[in-house]
């Protein structure tokens, strides 16, 4: 279809060109024809390329072909097939000898590239349906899809491959049994975790998924301003209705919120707060409690802590420590750095720490607390740079104590400088460091979830409107 449209457009341009060169039309018409020809060719080329990429990103059959083994092609994926649940669960549990991460093959890399495109460009509905792994069927026979906390972290972490035989609308089926499910709560979330408060087993519904991504992608300062705007009586508290307004406004400013559309056919619609376990958590069982900004920011801090803990545990720490290379991978996960440069940075890290002692979760958490104040850190580092002081490890530790009130260990600073000390002179490349760390802090959730085609066409139309009048006027 794109080829036919392109050929027809080029044919019309050729006819117009012959008419333009063969006649003696006024100068104004010729200039308009030149402008139309240029814009038409640019639009056809851009739309063909971008829509072709879009088709690849949105096409579900691709991953089915990639993730299906030859021997499994005849398997029945019926949603009511509960008999194979134990077998699927056993397949998903890693064996002790398989804990060491294998090197990704060609097929795995292609699957991860496809999943990264889903994370980057798909709607929240499709992302949720792809990375969720559980479908719970209640007693009346109605089914609802849920994410586990591990599924949630995987849905926002690049290059984390979905388990085999689970993908878009492919789930592990569970029959609802209140007693049995309450006994399985510890399988999904530790007691004291934010996820433990999310209803049954710490499972995440679609409404909770949208809310949690909104909390993770919104700076603390934005919530403080929103709470003050809707705190009409000035007592520092908001009720449930006011919180719904705060939540709706904040969500509409995020990339997830802007891309979401209710899909009744898939069951993924944003429900009101009355149905959310989070609303019960904030306002009590009778929903008549009050929520303060202090309590909400504490919830945000705990959520960030729990997500970071899950990321840490995914690396299978040995004696409570992960390797320096794994920590570097956590820092660069959302960087968007080109693959060649990323590989070079990881090799440099491996060269410096062939037999490193590793990092504890406390060291990792202290560094990410430091990153939460990255804007203030950027200002402080700029002051040091303008004053002519070198940005060495001692300076970074001083900035961490002053700005974030945390202590960075010497070993953490060694790892960071091994990544971002490009010329090996012991000084930090602060511009690249701050840029990558800002993306890491937001986990890529602030990026627009589109191919940029609409923005391109709007820019071209605006440019055409501004320049058309100049082309139409004859030169004096």
From Swiss-Prot:
Gene3D superfamilies: EF-hand. Residues 126-129, 259-263 are annotated as: K/R-ring. Residues 99-110 are annotated as: Polybasic region. The modification Asymmetric dimethylarginine is found at residue 455. Ca(2+) 2 binds at residues 421, 423, 425, 427, 432. InterPro entries: EF-hand-dom_pair, EF_Hand_1_Ca_BS, EF_hand_dom, MICU1/2/3. Residues 455-465 are annotated as: C-helix region. The EF-hand domains have high affinity for calcium and act as sensors of calcium levels. This is Calcium uptake protein 1, mitochondrial. It comes from Macaca fascicularis. The gene is MICU1.
């Amino acid at each position: 279809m794109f080829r036919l449209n392109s050929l027809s457009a080029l044919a019309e341009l050729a006819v117009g060109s012959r008419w333009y060169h063969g006649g003696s039309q006024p100068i104004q018409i010729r200039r308009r024809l030149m402008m139309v020809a240029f814009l038409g060719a640019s639009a056809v080329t851009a739309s063909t390329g971008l829509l072709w990429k879009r088709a690849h990103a949105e096409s579900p059959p691709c991953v089915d072909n990639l993730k299906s083994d030859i021997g499994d092609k005849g398997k029945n994926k019926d949603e009511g097939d509960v008999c194979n649940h134990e077998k699927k669960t056993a397949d998903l549990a890693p064996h002790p000898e398989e804990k060491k991460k294998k090197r990704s093959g060609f097929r795995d890399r292609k699957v991860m590239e496809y999943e990264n495109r889903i994370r980057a460009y798909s709607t929240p509905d499709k992302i949720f349906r792809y990375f969720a792994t559980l479908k719970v069927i209640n007693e009346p026979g109605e089914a609802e899809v849920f994410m586990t906390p591990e599924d949630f972290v995987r849905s926002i972490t690049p290059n984390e491959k979905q388990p085999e035989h689970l993908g878009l609308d492919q789930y592990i089926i569970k029959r609802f049994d209140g007693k049995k499910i309450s006994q399985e709560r510890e399988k999904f979330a530790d007691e004291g975790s934010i996820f433990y408060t999310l209803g049954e087993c710490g499972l995440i519904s679609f409404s909770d998924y949208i809310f949690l991504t909104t909390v993770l992608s919104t700076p603390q300062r934005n919530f403080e301003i929103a709470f003050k705007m809707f705190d009409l009586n000035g007592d520092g508290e908001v009720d449930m209705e006011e919180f719904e307004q705060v939540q709706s406004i904040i969500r509409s400013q995020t990339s997830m919120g802007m891309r979401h559309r209710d899909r009744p056919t898939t069951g993924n619609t944003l429900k009101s707060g009355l149905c959310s376990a989070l609303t019960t958590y904030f306002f009590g069982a009778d929903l008549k409690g009050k929520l303060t900004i202090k309590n909400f920011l504490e919830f945000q801090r705990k959520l960030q802590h729990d997500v970071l803990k899950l990321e840490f545990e995914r690396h299978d720490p040995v004696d409570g420590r992960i390797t320096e290379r794994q920590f570097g991978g956590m820092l660069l996960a959302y960087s968007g750095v080109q693959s060649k440069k990323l590989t070079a940075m990881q090799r440099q890290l491996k060269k410096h720490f062939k037999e490193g002692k590793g990092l504890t979760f406390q060291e990792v958490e202290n560094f990410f607390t430091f990153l939460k104040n990255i804007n203030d850190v950027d200002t402080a580092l700029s002051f040091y740079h303008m004053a002519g002081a070198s940005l060495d490890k001692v300076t970074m530790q001083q900035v961490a104590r002053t700005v974030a009130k945390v202590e960075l260990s010497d070993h953490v600073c060694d790892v960071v400088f091994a990544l971002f000390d490009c010329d090996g002179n012991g000084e930090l490349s602060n511009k690249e460091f701050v840029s990558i760390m800002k993306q890491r802090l937001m986990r890529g959730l602030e990026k627009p979830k589109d191919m940029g085609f609409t923005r391109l066409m709007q820019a071209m139309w605006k440019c055409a409107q501004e320049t058309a009048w100049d082309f139409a006027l004859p030169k004096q």
